[in-house]
Amino acid sequence: MYGPQEDEEKVLFLQELRNIIGLCNGPWLLAGDFNLIYQAANKNNANLDRAMMGRFRRFLDDSEVKELPLLGRKYTWSNERMSPTLVRLDQAFCCLDWEDIFPGSILQSAASGVSDHCPLILGLKIKITGKRRFHFESFWTKVPGFRFFGGGAAELGGSCAN
């Protein structure tokens, strides 16, 4: 999504999002350039529109959403000046149903040489738990020089140099 830049339009944008969310059943995710921040930590200077921040924060609270963590950087937009303003305008928020189905949802930042925004990739942070099983691939036997030892390392008889 792309949020408007003008304050009057931002108020209408948030109301439109409320209306859309009200129609949603099941898991959903809002992602894109909101052109809004809800906390001072999302900007690298103190030039803040606190009234608009409050409106966005109330919208997020009322919508009962969770913000997806951003990996790789803190800010997603720069005005690209010598002393840049940096802001996290690009974000993703999910409902609780989404979080139940995709509990490891994340945003990964990517490099961009084309835009003043960095691209974000939606992904899952997967945890591998437990002991991993050995999996034999039958094509290995066709690889020249392949030798399979079914037992443990102690049964190989020899050193690592052999």
Where are each of the predicted segments found?
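A shared catalytic/ligand-binding motif for oxyanion handling
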Residues: 1-162
